[in-house]
């Protein structure tokens, strides 16, 4: 109090007073924090609308405002990054920052955008590389190029007449050797067609009392096995067109053949599979029994350790080199299993296809004895073959379209569907370079298709590509 008895007036602050300002209350701090961090708690898939007259401040980023503000002495060494960031923030239509040397009044106009925003923008991608907007709208971001699907020619590049090519689902009358020679059984004769020279050679004639039911090349491509309707298996020297030996065992026709080095497996209508070592004097070294109906499909794995067999009893069996009983049995198919193919890319991966009542391609892991997947193709599966160049396979089909389908594995997406045959496509073989397939049908034609790419490890021209186009006869 002063001398008059009045209270002293409160001190007034001056310009030179260095006393600190009063601290904000905790409630004010929480309010400011909520305002600053409001964007971080907004759902990326939810659009928030504000009042029709009051803009939504949550959509604004004031901390980034000076990105586009000209600054004296700013280093322009990171112009590329600045351009990319500006595009991500304000869009591709915003002009770049201008310096005072360029103009005295820098423009902050945002074309095609409202100054006030009345709703928050919804982020399009939860995996966006940009923290501000969808990558698709940022032209400065380089995306991985989308690989265009490989184009497969829809027409065969060559057609051969094949008179007397039988329309029998249980036979295997076409095979392609490692020496690029195609063997075809026509009636009671076997013909060889050299894919390099287009030369046709008549290998054998079984006579009027017999007919060819199967052909199969040895892995070296020098010898051809011929299964006959009388139950015999003949071995021919292809270069000399000379029969080396004839082996018995089957009581009925031999419709399936498969080689494993010097071991030849034959499957017949008598439900049996015979293992024959052509180096020995005996006609067969073992007999495999298990199927309850005709054996119509046989394939050795690429490591020659497992033999897969399919029969008209709707069964798929897997045998090893020493077993006389199947080590694996698969009974999921509901029709005859003729189409069998081992993957050259993954050990133990086996594909099989069922007949008219089944229509499915199934995949099996013989290492773990498991069923992997099933694809309903919509029609009879007549044959299967894997590409050795890419992880794809081809299936041939019967009624109603008689189509040839190229599949990607494991997605089983269709790469191409080829048509042209007027009968079911019963026969299928692949060229030694892995690029071309040949298909045969009861319409008595053989059609050649380029479906697979060349091997990446070598730059080779397809030996088949030099062949003349058009239609010729194989005999």
From Swiss-Prot:
Chain segments carrying region Disordered: 1-29
Residue ranges of the motif CSM motif: 80-91
Renumbered ranges of motif PEST motif: 7-28
Pathway: Protein modification; protein ubiquitination
GO molecular function, a single term: ubiquitin ligase activator activity
Pfam families, A to Z: WD40_CDC20-Fz
Family designation: Belongs to the WD repeat CDC20/Fizzy family.
Protein name per Swiss-Prot or TrEMBL: B-type cell cycle switch protein ccs52A
Organism for this UniProt entry: Medicago truncatula
């Amino acid at each position: 109090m002063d001398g008059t008895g009045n209270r002293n007036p409160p001190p007034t602050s001056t310009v030179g007073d260095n006393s600190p300002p009063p601290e904000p209350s905790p409630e004010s701090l929480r309010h400011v924090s909520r305002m600053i961090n409001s964007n971080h708690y907004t759902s990326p898939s939810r659009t928030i609308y504000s009042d029709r007259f009051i803009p939504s401040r949550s959509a604004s980023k004031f901390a980034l405002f000076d990105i586009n503000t000209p600054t004296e002495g700013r280093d322009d060494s990171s112009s590329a990054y600045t351009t990319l960031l500006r595009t991500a923030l304000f869009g591709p239509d915003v002009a770049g920052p201008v310096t005072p040397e360029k103009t005295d009044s820098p423009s902050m106009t945002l074309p095609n955008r409202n100054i006030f925003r009345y709703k928050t923008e919804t982020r399009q991608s939860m995996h966006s590389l940009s923290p501000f907007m969808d990558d698709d709208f940022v032209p400065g971001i380089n995306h991985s190029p989308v690989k265009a699907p490989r184009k497969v020619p829809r027409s065969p590049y060559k057609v051969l007449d094949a008179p007397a090519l039988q329309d029998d689902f249980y036979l295997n009358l076409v095979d392609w050797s490692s020496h690029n020679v195609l063997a075809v059984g026509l009636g009671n004769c076997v013909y060889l067609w050299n894919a390099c020279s287009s030369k046709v050679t008549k290998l054998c004639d079984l006579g009027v009392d017999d007919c060819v039911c199967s052909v199969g090349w040895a892995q070296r491509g020098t010898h051809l096995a011929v299964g006959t309707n009388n139950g015999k298996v003949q071995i021919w020297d292809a270069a000399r067109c000379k029969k080396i030996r004839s082996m018995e065992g089957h009581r009925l026709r031999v419709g399936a053949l498969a080689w494993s080095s010097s071991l030849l497996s034959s499957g017949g209508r008598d439900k049996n599979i015979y293992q024959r070592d052509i180096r020995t004097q005996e006609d067969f070294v073992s007999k495999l029994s298990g199927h309850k109906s005709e054996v119509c499909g046989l394939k050795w794995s690429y490591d020659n350790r497992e033999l897969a067999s399919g029969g008209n009893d709707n069964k798929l069996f897997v045998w090893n080199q020493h077993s006389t009983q199947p080590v694996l049995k698969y009974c999921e198919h509901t029709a005859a299993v003729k189409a069998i193919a081992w993957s050259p890319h993954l050990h133990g991966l086996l594909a099989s296809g069922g007949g008219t009542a089944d229509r499915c391609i199934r995949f099996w892991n013989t290492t773990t004895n498991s069923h992997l997947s099933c694809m309903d193709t919509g029609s009879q599966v007549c044959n299967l073959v894997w590409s050795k160049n890419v992880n794809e396979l081809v299936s041939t089909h019967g009624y109603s379209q008689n189509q040839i389908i190229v599949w990607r594995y494991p997605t089983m997406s269709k790469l191409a569907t080829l048509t042209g045959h007027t009968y079911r496509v019963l026969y299928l073989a692949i060229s030694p370079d892995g690029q071309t397939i040949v298909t045969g049908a009861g319409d008595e034609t053989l059609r050649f298709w380029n479906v697979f790419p060349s091997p990446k490890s070598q730059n080779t021209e397809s030996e088949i590509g030099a062949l003349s186009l058009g239609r010729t006869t194989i005999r």
